[in-house]
């Protein structure tokens, strides 16, 4: 005995509804991520400015112990896209974990940019480090993290 035409129609409608529902969820998630992009970029800029101010304070008081400095380079995964807030990004969590182990201040500069590629890290983020005096100045980082490549595999050159 075969499956009735009505059963096929119901199954098809259910599958179509599930597809539309799933597609709607995916679109909603993409829109949330898109709105995060600007918010997170601004939050990291504010964080970075505060970190640079703290480094300047340390410069003015050279007797104190130099903070442990982490610089993070990369793309949206480094920005924390998808996390509930920037403190849940992996660089912030890494800085927090290192801070828990060290008996000194830990500072984080996150120079990442959503949409970054290998080329853009090379042409913008590394020169930004140089411009801030982080490659050859008194505040060379103790740790540099790099997460890149997701956007590169999406290009036609790959």
What kind of feature is each model-predicted range?
Residues 79-158:
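Conserved SGNH/GDSL esterase-like catalytic core that processes O-acyl groups on lipids
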């Amino acid at each position: 005995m075969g499956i009735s035409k009505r059963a096929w129609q119901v199954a098809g409608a259910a599958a179509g509804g599930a597809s539309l529902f799933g597609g709607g969820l995916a679109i909603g998630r993409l829109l949330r991520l898109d709105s995060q992009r600007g918010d997170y970029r601004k939050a990291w800029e504010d964080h970075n400015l505060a970190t640079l101010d703290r480094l300047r304070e340390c410069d003015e008081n050279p007797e104190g112990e130099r903070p442990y400095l982490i610089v993070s380079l990369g793309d949206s995964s480094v920005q924390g896209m998808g996390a509930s807030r920037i403190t849940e990004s992996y660089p912030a969590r890494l800085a927090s974990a290192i801070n828990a182990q060290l008996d000194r201040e830990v500072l984080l500069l996150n120079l990442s940019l959503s949409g970054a590629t290998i080329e853009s890290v090379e042409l913008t983020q590394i020169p930004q480090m140089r411009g801030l005096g982080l490659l050859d100045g008194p505040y060379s980082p103790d740790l540099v993290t790099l997460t890149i490549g997701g956007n590169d595999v999406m290009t036609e050159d790959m």
